């Protein structure tokens, strides 16, 4: 799964990864792009294919580097136009489609989150309380060994001078997250 395909991995990072890993050209690669949860979508697609008897072994996961998302130039709105618009593709639509945005808006996922919170009356305090509780539940599950069978440890090179780093767990959850710490974070939008 990959959200914002750009760079040297081209548009089909799954195929590139399979070939560069030494898989024969007869092994297909399929990149899933559903924006949020692309990696999880790839895992679900693989599980579904195994369940349906379409194969016995699938390699699935997610890759993303939003910091490398490109700035892009939209097409001119009229012939010989000199008013090129540049779009930051890190968050939001790469090339806004006016028909779509006029009907549905052009909100990014964080903006949509704020809109939903406003619509349902979810305060910042309630959101931070939920987020802190979610982090605490993850930490308790991790300490109980709940995730031990779900992540296969891998070694990642750190260059010639350092030994490989062993990756054994998800990097995002933060054991130190508290309501107080979260409430000090500046909101992205007002």
Regions found by a protein language model. Give the residues of each.
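Short glycine-/small-residue-rich flexible loop motifs, especially phosphate/cofactor-binding loops
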Residues: 15, 114, 139
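N-terminal extracellular/periplasmic Venus flytrap/periplasmic-binding protein-like
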Residues: 126-190
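Flexible glycine-/small-residue-enriched beta->alpha junction loops
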Residues: 57-115
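Active-site-proximal alpha-helical scaffold in enzymes
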Residues: 34-64, 117-146
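Short, well-ordered secondary-structure micro-motifs
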Residues: 9-10, 70-71, 165-170
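Short glycine-rich anion-binding loops that position phosphate/pyrophosphate groups of nucleotides
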Residues: 3-5, 63-66, 159
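Conserved catalytic cysteine-centered active-site region
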Residues: 2-58, 90-92, 103-109, 176-190
